[in-house]
């Protein structure tokens, strides 16, 4: 279980999030959606204990992947994934291998991350989070800059991870991905939660937050049926 208890979140002397009460538990894939500046990343950082005054979190229990996280050039894919074991103080091979397989990188374990595609490098960072073997994943836009097929594959992996008993909270800017994969959709606008419900029930609030025309259907048309 992880969440936020309603305390206002202030940055630079300005309240950017207020009246936020959110709880996410095992088995859930919670997608945070909303327009730019809505406070999605700020809320996730607060939940991860990365903001001044926010409760510190145990890095063995929570895997945090910030927006735009980059691999260290010169490392191999396996070495990047192994960084996820640092909070545990060990270099156990088994969790790293499971992470590589889960992220579809077992064939690239010895490849340098500066010699693979951007999408593969992003998956290497995700493998780092998986190698931590956490109870909770807090991921800020892990599908950014990926092609639709790769983004769908990562979201399907995260949904399966949640179904296996982990808690996954993810910022997703592509509304169609969130509607297709989330078990809960949390919509933020102007620093407040405007909806927190299963995707079908939160659709109207999500469309309003993104400024979509009334009656517009943003549901996915090109993604395969969810397993």
Regions found by a protein language model. Give the residues of each.
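The feature captures the beta-strand-to-loop junction immediately N-terminal to the Walker
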Residues: 33-35
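Helix-to-loop junction immediately C-terminal to a conserved catalytic motif
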Residues: 48
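Conserved ABC ATPase "signature" region
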Residues: 93-108
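Conserved ABC ATPase signature
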Residues: 112-116
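ABC ATPase C-loop
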Residues: 129-130
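Catalytic Walker B motif of ABC-type/P-loop ATPase nucleotide-binding domains
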Residues: 137-141
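H-loop/switch region of ABC-family ATPase nucleotide-binding domains
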Residues: 172-173
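ABC ATPase nucleotide-binding domains
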Residues: 207-227
């Amino acid at each position: 279980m992880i969440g936020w208890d309603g305390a206002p979140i202030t940055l630079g002397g300005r309240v950017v999030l207020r009246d936020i009460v959110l709880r996410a538990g095992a088995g859930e894939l919670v997608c945070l959606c909303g327009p730019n500046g809505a406070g999605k990343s700020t809320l996730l950082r607060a939940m991860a204990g990365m903001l001044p005054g926010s409760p510190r979190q145990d890095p063995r229990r929570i895997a945090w992947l910030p927006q735009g996280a980059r691999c260290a050039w010169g490392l191999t894919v396996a070495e990047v994934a192994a960084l996820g074991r640092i909070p545990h103080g060990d270099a156990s091979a088994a969790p790293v291998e499971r992470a590589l397989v889960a992220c579809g990188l077992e064939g690239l374990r010895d490849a340098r991350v500066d010699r693979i595609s951007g999408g593969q490098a992003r998956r290497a960072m995700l493998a780092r989070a998986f190698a931590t073997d956490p109870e909770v994943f807090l991921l800020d836009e892990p599908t950014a800059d990926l092609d639709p097929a790769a983004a769908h594959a990562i979201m399907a992996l995260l949904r399966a991870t949640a179904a296996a008993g982990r808690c996954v909270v993810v910022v997703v800017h592509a509304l169609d991905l969130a509607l297709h994969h989330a078990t809960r959709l949390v919509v933020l606008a102007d620093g407040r939660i405007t909806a927190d419900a299963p995707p079908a029930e939160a659709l109207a609030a999500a469309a309003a937050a993104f400024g979509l025309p009334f009656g517009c259907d943003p549901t996915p048309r090109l993604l395969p049926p969810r397993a």
